[in-house]
């Protein structure tokens, strides 16, 4: 892409010197630059509620995009994953690249098109999980308010609740109960 980064021209290369940096001085990869430019619009297109877009954007950026940026820029070594390093998303997608002695003129494009739906499924699943956690947070905070001073928190279904308890400072909650079929779980 010409070793240039120009969001207005939709050029998102990160190989120029100095390379584009985040506010905290960590380097962007092309994926990070694209996410920074279009991530919020992507979340809107995925029907993430407006009030959750910033939090989910930042969460996805720090937990999904940043590690890819760091690996792509050599700021983090894949070996930090130990024997699982060949199973990182970057390594798995990289395994779809053409082999060194391939002579097909379309191999790079074919590999990209093979990787695209795989990457998309992980991106959308991750965002979906962050959005579900935000919905759970809201439900748990409502249940905490409804419970008042009771040491028992009743939730309408199983869901993540620990971060909402911490956020609300609900140290008085000793038990969390949720329905499971005709029974309850504690």
Question: For each of these PLM feature ranges, what is it?
Answer:
Residues 63-149, 159-161:
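RNase H-like (RuvC/DEDD) metal-dependent nuclease/polynucleotide-processing core
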């Amino acid at each position: 892409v010409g070793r240039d980064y120009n969001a207005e021209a939709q050029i998102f290369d990160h190989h120029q010197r100095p390379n584009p940096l985040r506010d905290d001085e960590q380097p962007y990869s092309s994926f990070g630059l694209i996410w920074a430019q279009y991530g919020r619009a992507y979340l809107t297109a995925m029907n993430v509620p407006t009030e959750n877009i910033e939090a989910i954007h930042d969460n996805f950026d720090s937990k999904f995009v940043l590690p890819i940026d760091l690996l792509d820029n050599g700021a983090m070594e894949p070996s930090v994953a130990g024997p699982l390093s060949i199973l990182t998303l970057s390594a798995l997608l990289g395994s779809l690249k053409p082999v060194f002695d391939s002579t097909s003129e379309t191999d790079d494009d074919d590999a990209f098109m093979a990787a695209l739906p795989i990457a998309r499924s992980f991106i959308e699943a991750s965002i979906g999980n962050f959005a579900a956690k935000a919905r759970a947070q809201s439900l748990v905070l409502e249940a905490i308010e409804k419970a008042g001073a009771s040491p028992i928190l009743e939730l309408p279904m199983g869901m993540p609740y620990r971060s909402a308890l911490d956020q609300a400072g609900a140290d008085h909650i000793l038990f969390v109960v949720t329905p499971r079929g005709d029974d309850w779980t504690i």
